[in-house]
Design a protein with these regions (language model features):
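Metzincin-family zinc-dependent endopeptidase catalytic domain
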Residues: 1-108, 131-135, 159
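Short secondary-structure capping/turn micro-motifs that flank functional sites
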Residues: 17-18, 116, 122-123
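Hydrophobic alpha-helical segments
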Residues: 61, 69, 75, 117, ...
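Catalytic Zn2+-binding segment of zinc metalloproteases
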Residues: 105-120
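Conserved catalytic/binding loops enriched for acidic/polar residues
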Residues: 120-245
Length: 245
């Protein structure tokens, strides 16, 4: 919103203790505890007469963080010789939660998925991001697993959706100009209709991917997988943890 010229237009605060979560005056991020996997959601209450978004509600499940931590543990954990990277593993999990929160809040603001953003250096939080697992000096590295900022595409989306125009402006023409400017920056938009149906499999709309070339990324991630599996043993578990965990 700041990129669109609106300072402090978007703020996050703790819900007052006496507030009703169903109160339409409050946009809500709700934390839900789950013992099994479940989706996170970003939904809106919309005025059917005008399309105006009246209230946004995000639901984030607790199990996601545990799953991401276990993935990180399997990739970089080494409790036999070095347990100091526990904070790094938890940090990666929190980075994923941060990205997911922005993604679901984006939905409440009216933003759809954009699966082509991974081709453009993670240009949108509205993609389905695969953690960027890298190899450094022959070891798995998660320091750049998830982007920690709003993408350039997201800024253009908010500008397009929320910009106020001076009286007398040809709004349709002005909105098309914004799209042209975005395209001029090398940013594009491809969503579910381009990615999910069998007849709409655009080659750059893979879900959960990184990079420009699917073939090059497959070769890169296969090398990561090879090294990860070669080091996947009991060292990944804390002392005293059952193997069945």
């Amino acid at each position: 919103f700041e990129a669109a010229g609106y300072k402090d237009a978007f703020q996050v605060k703790l819900l007052p203790a006496d507030a009703d979560p169903m109160d339409v005056r409050y946009n809500l991020v709700q934390w839900v505890h789950r013992s099994t996997r479940g989706w996170s959601y970003g939904t809106s209450v919309v005025d059917p007469r005008t399309g105006e978004i009246l209230k946004g509600k995000v639901t984030l499940g607790s199990l996601r963080v545990r799953q991401d931590y276990l993935i990180a543990q399997g990739l970089v954990g080494d409790f036999k010789t070095d347990s100091s990277n526990v904070e790094d593993m938890m940090g990666m999990s929190i980075e994923r939660l941060r990205q997911l929160s922005a993604h679901e809040i984006g939905h409440t603001l009216g933003l759809p998925h954009n699966y082509v953003s991974s081709v453009h250096d993670r240009a949108s939080v509205m993609d389905y991001p695969h953690m960027l697992v890298e190899l450094k000096n022959g070891k798995v590295d998660l320091s750049n697993a998830y982007d920690q900022k709003i993408g350039e595409y997201d800024k253009w989306s908010i500008i397009w959706g929320y910009q106020d125009f001076p009286k007398g402006t040809d709004e349709k023409k002005a909105l098309n100009t914004i799209v042209d400017q975005m395209y001029g920056k090398g940013l594009y938009f491809l969503t579910d209709q381009d990615a999910r149906p069998e007849g709409s499999a655009h080659p750059q709309t893979h879900l959960w991917d990184n990079g420009v070339s699917a073939v090059a990324e497959l070769k890169r991630i296969s090398e990561v997988r090879k090294i990860t599996l070669a080091n996947f043993d009991e060292r990944k578990l804390r002392t005293g943890t059952p193997m069945s965990s």
